[in-house]
Amino acid sequence: MRTSAGADRHLPKLTSCNEIRHMRPLRIAPLVALLACARPDAAAAAADGADTVVVFTAASLAVPVRAALDSFARRTGAVVQQENGASLELARRITELGRVPDVIALADQEVFPGVLVPRAASWYARFARNRMVVAFTDRSAGATRLTASNWYEVLSRPGVRVGRSDPRLAPVGYRALLLYRLAEGHYGVPELASRLEASTPPALVRSNASELVALLQAGELDYIVDYESLARANHLRFVTLPPAIDLSDPARAAAYALASVRVARRTDTVTYAGAPIVYGASVPRAATHPAAGQRFLSFLLSPAGQAVLRAHAVDALRVPELVGDSVPPALRATRQ
């Protein structure tokens, strides 16, 4: 959840975000979107460009969505294109640069009501969860002593190099800071959040996860604070953190919300409150190939698509939720 102070003229002025946030979600049946598995006929493909699907993907979803796109292409014959980046950066490519994909899949579903709805998108799907972990390699300083109970001591020691993503661009960046605040309360260690933040100097704050992974694997970093799916996709070692702080448990939403961080942007400051990690996806209003985008998203939410996500350590929701009044009929028809 986010609130902002000041004006950001680079983002759309949203007048109905609260309306979208409080729309009743639509539950999608597990037998969702069999249409996604059927190849469109040639006339339909020619009419709406269904043979091409362009997808913007949050960095932590890059590998799972690539696998899903490949599976979709094999089933339908579609030409698939993927562009990866930090979630907030991807959203701004749409709102500021006018570069509009057929599907956008982001690491924080709140980016939709906060940035994209209602101008760039009119609905979105909540489709997956994740958890925060501490990833490392055998060469990491203190790796032989690292455990789930002392990770914060190891990371806050002098000389240990910890990387994290830029909270102005990537949800995982502000989630790392929220993790630190929750850890301070959970472990009862005064000033722990400040100490953990100090373990990452500005030079080790990067715009996307791929840079952090490369630095970690090259030995330029000792640890990165990121998602479990990213660690698994890159075959990194990682420490699983307590559910009380790893932002994975929907039942702990109220407890997570007790933590908050303020992030200074170009023209304003945004406050993010802790919340369970939930991924979101949509077909933007100005998509070039909207029907093809809907077919791919239907596939991604189907049992076959969910299986691909789970194979890459993404906790796909068995019953995804659709939020908004303008859900495409092909998706709406699948709800219970």
Which sequence ranges carry the predicted segments?
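Short, intrinsically disordered or compositionally biased N-terminal tails of bacterial proteins
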Residues: 2-3, 9-24
